[in-house]
Curated annotation (Swiss-Prot):
The gene is fbpB. Substrate binds at residues 82-83, 166, 194, 272-275, 279, 302-304. Keywords: Acyltransferase, Disulfide bond, Secreted, Signal, Transferase. This is Diacylglycerol acyltransferase/mycolyltransferase Ag85B. GO terms for molecular function: diacylglycerol O-acyltransferase activity; trehalose O-mycolyltransferase activity. Residues 1-40 form the signal peptide. The keyword Disulfide bond applies. Coiled coil: none annotated. Pfam families: Esterase. The antigen 85 proteins (FbpA, FbpB, FbpC) are responsible for the high affinity of mycobacteria for fibronectin, a large adhesive glycoprotein, which facilitates the attachment of M.tuberculosis to murine alveolar macrophages (AMs). They also help to maintain the integrity of the cell wall by catalyzing the transfer of mycolic acids to cell wall arabinogalactan and through the synthesis of alpha,alpha-trehalose dimycolate (TDM, cord factor).
Length: 325
C-alpha cells in the first residue's frame, strides 16, 4: 500500500508540474523569449551585411546577417529562439553581438527567420498562422549556406561553432552531432536537453502552436517517431564525447541576478529546463567527456540579459577553439 501511495503521489506531482508548464509555455516566452538587453543592437557603422542566400531545399532565398572576420576565418552561427522574427535575428535585436565580435577573427553569421523550426528538416510543410512554407533548415545551415559563404565571402566551411538559445540550444548540439567537421563547437544556452522524453513533445507542441500556430507533428511526426530521438541531445552524448566536440552549456537557476530578467515566466521556464541540463552534465561526465564548460550554478532567468553575458564570456574560448587569427 505504501508503494502504491508513493506512486500516486509521484504521479500527482508530475501532473502538477506538467499542468504548470503547459500553462506557462504558450504565450509567455515559449522556449525562446526573454526581454531585450539594455544595449540591444550593435552600434552603427559596423561592416554588417544583409545577405540573401539562395536555398534550393527551401525554395526561396534566406536572409542572413553577416559580419566578416577576415579571409578564411572560422564562423560562429548564432541561432535564434522559438519566436524568431523575419526582419532580424534575435541576437541582433537583443544584444550588440556584432559589436562584441568585431575584429575578433571570427565571422558572425545570423540566419533570419525559422520561427518554431528547431533549425531542423521538417517532414511536412511548416503550416502556421501566416500560411505554409518549407522548413529544411538543417540542409541550409550545413550545406547550402556554408558553401555559399565559402565561395562568396571566404568563410571557412569547416571548423565552425553553433551557438543557440532555448529552442536553438538543442539544435546547436544536434548540428554538431551530425555534422562534426563543420561544427566542432556547440553552445547551448537555456535549452531543454531531452525534448523527446516525458512531456517534452506535448509541451513543445503547445509552445509551437502559440509561436506561429505550428504543429510539432509536421516537424518530427508523432512522439513515437525516431525523429524525436534523433533530435534529442541527451541521447547523443556518446557522439559528442567521441568527436571531442567543444561544448559550452549554460542554464540559470531561475532566480534573477543584477542583470535583470525578473519576471515570473522567465523565472519559471529557466527553472523548468534546468533539470535536463543537470542530467546532461552528469551523463556527459559519466561518459568520459572532458571538453566542456558547464555554467549551471549561477542565478539567471530565461532572458537575453543572461544569454548575452554568456556569448561575451565564451568569446575567448571560441577564438581559441576555432583558431581565430
Amino acid at each position: 500500500m505504501t508503494d502504491v501511495s508513493g506512486k500516486i503521489r509521484a504521479w500527482g506531482r508530475r501532473l502538477l508540474v506538467g499542468a504548470a508548464a503547459a500553462a506557462a509555455l504558450p504565450g509567455l516566452v515559449g522556449l525562446a523569449g526573454g526581454a531585450a538587453t539594455a544595449g540591444a543592437f550593435s552600434r552603427p557603422g559596423l561592416p554588417v551585411e544583409y545577405l540573401q542566400v539562395p536555398s534550393a531545399a527551401m525554395g526561396r532565398s534566406i536572409k542572413v546577417q553577416f559580419q566578416s572576420g577576415g579571409d578564411n576565418s572560422p564562423a560562429v552561427y548564432l541561432l535564434d529562439g522559438l519566436r524568431a522574427q523575419d526582419d532580424y535575428n534575435g541576437w541582433d535585436i537583443n544584444t550588440p553581438a556584432f559589436e562584441w565580435y568585431y575584429q575578433s577573427g571570427l565571422s558572425v553569421i545570423m540566419p533570419v527567420g525559422g520561427q518554431s523550426s528547431f533549425y531542423s528538416d521538417w517532414y511536412s510543410p511548416a503550416c502556421g498562422k501566416a500560411g505554409c512554407t518549407t522548413y529544411k533548415w538543417e540542409t541550409f545551415l550545413t550545406s547550402e549556406l556554408p558553401q555559399w559563404l565559402s565561395a562568396n565571402r571566404s568563410v571557412k566551411p569547416t571548423g565552425s561553432a553553433a551557438v543557440g538559445i532555448s529552442m536553438a540550444g538543442s539544435s546547436a548540439l544536434i548540428l554538431s552531432v551530425y555534422h562534426p567537421q563543420q561544427f566542432i563547437y556547440a553552445g547551448s544556452l537555456s535549452a531543454l536537453m531531452d525534448p523527446s522524453q516525458g512531456m517534452g513533445p506535448s509541451l513543445i507542441g503547445l509552445a509551437m502552436g502559440d509561436a506561429g500556430g505550428y504543429k510539432a507533428s509536421d516537424m518530427w511526426g508523432p512522439s513515437s517517431d525516431p525523429a524525436w530521438q534523433r533530435n534529442d541531445p541527451s541521447l547523443h552524448i556518446p557522439e559528442l564525447v567521441a568527436n571531442n566536440t567543444r561544448l559550452w552549456i549554460y542554464c540559470g537557476n531561475g532566480t534573477p541576478s543584477e542583470l535583470g530578467g525578473a519576471n515570473v515566466p522567465a523565472e519559471f521556464l529557466e527553472n523548468f529546463v534546468r533539470s535536463s541540463n543537470l542530467k546532461f552534465q552528469d551523463a556527459y561526465n559519466a561518459a568520459g567527456g572532458h571538453n566542456a564548460v558547464f555554467n549551471l550554478d549561477a542565478n539567471g532567468t530565461h532572458s537575453w540579459e543572461y544569454w548575452g553575458a554568456q556569448l561575451n564570456a565564451m568569446k575567448g574560448d571560441l577564438q581559441a577553439s576555432l583558431g581565430a587569427r
